[in-house]
Amino acid sequence: MDKILILDFGGQYTQLIARRIRDLNVYSEIVDYDISIEEIIKKNPKGIILSGGYDSVYGDRSIKPNKGIWDLNIPILGICYGFQVMMQENGGQVENDKDSEEYGSTDIRLTTNELFENIELDNNCWMSHSDSVIFLPKGFKVIASTNKCLVASACNREKKFYGVQFHPEVTQTTFGNQLLQNFVYSICDVAGDWEPKNIKLEKIEEIKSIVKDDYVLCAISGGVDSLVAAVLTAQAIGDKLYCVFVDHGLLRKNESQEVCALLKKLIGKNIFLVDQKQLFLSKLKGVVDPEQKRKIIGKTFIEVFEKVANKINVPFKYLLQGTIYPDIVESGSKFSKTIKSHHNVGGLPERLQFELLEPLKYLFKDEVRKLGLSLDIPYQNVYRQPFPGPGLAVRVLGEITEDKLEIVREADFLFRSYIDQLYKNSEHKPWQYFTVLTNSKSVGVVGDNRSYGYTLALRAVDSMDAMSAKWYKIPLEHLEKISSIICNKVKNISRVVYDITNKPPGTIEWE
């Protein structure tokens, strides 16, 4: 299978680059910026992309790729910081020039070049840089400019080195997808054979080669990711997989029963339901910080699994988790800053007795869904809404109590039921929609009496891969009806508000 290697210099969009390449049916893999030449040769990529980053290439602590990368005779595309690294390492010069700083949407003038094939020459791109290339290496020429940045793109056609100061991976660069397509297909000459059926076969073989004759304990959370991971692993190793579903009391209405029924149907045997509602509530008592909630839940999950594993009396070696790419992104990579820890990657204790098995960790959400369909998981289950591993604990702001959980659980059920009915015949249904119980109270009126209840937030977004999201524009008349239904049917709710924050700057979940 042809692949594109992406060297990660810590930029916030590195995983988005990988996502865009995979959209083109080309496998992409993210590796550390300082990967050895031997390892690159072993991976045998058709092309290399150098990601953006936070540093300045001329700084004392700047990070650079292995120098041998320029002699591999492999096409290379540098993006933002990656472009500047390419220029400096090949004899060019980069400086901080206040007059050439650019942030946001920027008009750009392209020249005729294979990188810009089938692209309008007068166009618009997304810039985010304070440093600029001021002197080109020998053999390079300028192929794009803006009013402030004379070297917005450059190339050495003989070596097949290309660089852009802007970000083609973000949707704000209107021609970005076409540029990436030109690079991978026209310049790198890839086959384009990255498809769900290939993912399935590759992942099954990967699991078999890792697990061999050992046993796997699966951590089922109730979400799409852990379900797909479990069914995939079951097809790979059969009866050596044991699934444990922990009811931590933080699930949506009727979810525990629905998940267990589905697991028995899809996997069959070795399914264990563990009721630990009171344990999790006791551990979370008095905790208000969202990071602490996530870590406590992750740690408690592992403690429960260790006890269950001992009771089952099977020599488990691996713990299966449904970690996917966005989970890892938001928990911070080698150089990027942590947005929030993920329960699968940020809360595990050092004494963990299992080795982790995470077959989905390099897949995006829509790729996981496609994989799920190829595994014959029913469509309605594959395309159910994303639900965080910590469950309603991160949808109740402040301290977790049984009363608060019941409030947000019932409100969430009413909201989701209304939206499901409203958009049942529409192709433009929100990607994710849920309620958040804030820790704020406000005065209301019930009948002739004063009330003092919680403020509930409604959240609905449109997204493809959870890397970015836009708030969904539910018609106002329906928001009014939803508010009325919730306030009338759910006790202790006196006010309903609608969250209109995109991601970025916000995250999809509130905590």
Swiss-Prot record:
This is GMP synthase [glutamine-hydrolyzing]. It is an enzyme of class 6 (ligase). The active site is at C80, H167, E169. Homodimer. It comes from the Bacteria. Pathway: Purine metabolism; GMP biosynthesis; GMP from XMP (L-Gln route): step 1/1. ATP binds at S221, G222, G223, V224, D225, S226, L227. The keyword Nucleotide-binding applies. Keywords: ATP-binding, Glutamine amidotransferase, GMP biosynthesis, Ligase, Nucleotide-binding, Purine biosynthesis. It comes from Malacoplasma penetrans (strain HF-2). Its EC number is 6.3.5.2. Signal peptide: none annotated. Residues 3-193 form the Glutamine amidotransferase type-1 domain. The gene is guaA. Gene3D superfamilies: 3.30.300.10, 3.40.50.880, HUPs. One of its GO terms (cellular component) is cytosol. One of its GO terms (molecular function) is ATP binding.
